[in-house]
Structures are given as structure tokens and as C-alpha cells.
Amino acid sequence: DQKLDTATFYDKPYAYEVKKNKKREVKANILKMSLITKVVKAQGDTQSIVFDGKTPVVVINANEQEYDTKTGIMTATGTVTIKYKDLDTFSDKAKVRTDKNGDLKDIELIGNARIKQESNDSYADRFYYSAATKVLTATGNTTSKAIMDDGATLVLKANRQEYAQDRNIFNASGN
């Protein structure tokens, strides 16, 4: 009594999901869909795009991506790049969590992580951003370079840095 549990698609397949006004699509060399666990795995030259209406909001590229349709967790591994509005991120691994409507809950960048926004650049072992609190936390070997209003460059090195986006406040601790 054998049951088919995984569907595998080759030759650069494409899949998408629509929730309310948001569309999430994935392209890769190979797509695997578990019919039991409802997990989609993209392998080789993967790209995911989240649209709000017809506007691309987030573009994620990685060697491999896995999306659990039940939990709303997407895990990308291997040379991960994420483009979100005017923000570019780079890391070895990323986890993106969304709610049932497809809205961002949080994002985690793990390993050789970098965030670049305009002329500001931050590096850390790990970044964590909560959409609810609008707080970005960087931990492990953190370095931030920011260009001030007067043109001066600020370099901040610490073991932990925290940026409260809605209050525009930086906190740093540890050496």
C-alpha cells in the first residue's frame, strides 16, 4: 500500500500562492511539494517574490528555500539575499515568518549577516527583526557604519546592537 507523498517538478518550475491581495511566488531549478506536510522545497537558483497587489515587496534569492504552508515559515539557505524596499540583506541563512494573511511577523538573518540601507551598513553574526515592535537586534561581532547628517561617518562596534525603528534610537552593549 504505497502512497505518493512528494511531487517533484524539474526544468525551472514556478509555483504561487495568493492570500487576500498578496501573492507569493517561487521559482527554482527543482520544486518539491510534500502532499502530507504541505512543505514546498525549492532547490537550485531559487527566487521567491512577495507581491502586494502587482508591486513586488520582497525578493529573496538563495541556493535553497523551504516554505511550510501550515506555519508560514520560510527558510532560505546558501548565499541568501533579500531585497525589501530600500533595504538589502545578505546572509548564510534566513528565516521569514508571516501570519495567516501573509503579513510579515519577523525575520532572522543567521551567519555572515549584513544589512545595507542607502549609505548605512551593518554586519553581525545574527540579525532579528520584529514587525510588531519594529526593533532590529544584531548580535555577535556587530559593526554598523552610518553617514550622519553632517557627512561624518559613525562606526559602532559592539557585541549587541538594537535599533528601535519607530523611535530612531540605537542601543549598543558589550565589547
Indicate where each model-derived feature is located.
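Mature-chain termini and adjacent capping regions
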Residues: 1-175
